Amino acid sequence: MTSHPRDTPQFYLTAPSPCPYLPGQEERKVFTHLVGRRARDLNEILTQGGFRRSQTIAYRPACETCRACVSVRVVVEDFAITGSQRRILQRNAGLIGTPEPNRPASEQYALFRRYLDARHGDGGMVDMTVLDYAMMIEDSHVDTHLVVYRERGPDSAIHGRGVGAPVAVCLTDVLADGLSMVYSFYDPEAASRSLGTYMILDHIQRARALGLPYLYLGYWVDGSRKMDYKAKFKPQERLMPQGWVRVE
């Protein structure tokens, strides 16, 4: 019997299931566990290779007949903000995002619940309990944290924190070459503020301030309206069979 060192990743393939993005398609994923002393290094390598993280799992699409899911990352230093994106930043100038430890809180879950019910009522996460949410946030062996967005208060310029309940939240991994937005959610009743776009713009600024070259956005899915927004942050690089390809 061949033995494998505990730190050597083992990869597995899921059974086919309905694709959540493209009607009539089936998805399969290849995945491995991010555990042990090499979890952080493995997450770095796999993210650069097009994997995404969910708790202690790293996965990427391995569909048999479709290649629509494409990993994308924004080129931070060269990012060219558009007029509409600049207006979104101005519209949300009253918000401040604070990095916090990846610890769940009841006010986060309340916002998460409202977001799911309003935006993804037919999705696979809709039945997540408060315990499920806590595991999504806490269950990690990599360098990760929350960025919690609240309204600015009179003392926010002093202590860097907002006031009141969270308006938006992003679970963010810190990599050697960038930030990775693992999962984000926001107040569904504030649609006019374009909070999803705002958080991406804010994370581009955060990556630039840290001297990191990329912001990883996950998968852009050609043909899916849900994922069209990811193509609007340019220049970006898309992971193709020949490697990362720049798109202006």
UniProtKB/Swiss-Prot annotation:
Catalytic activity: N-terminal L-glutamyl-[protein] + L-leucyl-tRNA(Leu) = N-terminal L-leucyl-L-glutamyl-[protein] + tRNA(Leu) + H(+); N-terminal L-aspartyl-[protein] + L-leucyl-tRNA(Leu) = N-terminal L-leucyl-L-aspartyl-[protein] + tRNA(Leu) + H(+)
One GO BP annotation of this record: ubiquitin-dependent protein catabolic process via the N-end rule pathway
The entry's keywords: Acyltransferase, Cytoplasm, Transferase
Molecular-function GO terms, alphabetical: arginyl-tRNA--protein transferase activity; leucyl-tRNA--protein transferase activity
Location within or outside the cell: Cytoplasm
Gene Ontology cellular component annotations, sorted alphabetically: cytoplasm
Residues annotated as signal peptide: none
InterPro entries in the cross-refs: Acyl_CoA_acyltransferase, Asp_Glu_LeuTrfase, N-end_Aminoacyl_Trfase, N-end_Aminoacyl_Trfase_C, N-end_Aminoacyl_Trfase_N
EC number(s) given by UniProt: 2.3.2.29
Family label: Belongs to the R-transferase family. Bpt subfamily.
Function: Functions in the N-end rule pathway of protein degradation where it conjugates Leu from its aminoacyl-tRNA to the N-termini of proteins containing an N-terminal aspartate or glutamate.
HAMAP family: Bpt (MF_00689)
Full protein name: Aspartate/glutamate leucyltransferase
The species this protein was found in: Methylorubrum populi (strain ATCC BAA-705 / NCIMB 13946 / BJ001)
Organismal lineage: Bacteria, Pseudomonadati, Pseudomonadota, Alphaproteobacteria, Hyphomicrobiales
UniProt gene name: bpt
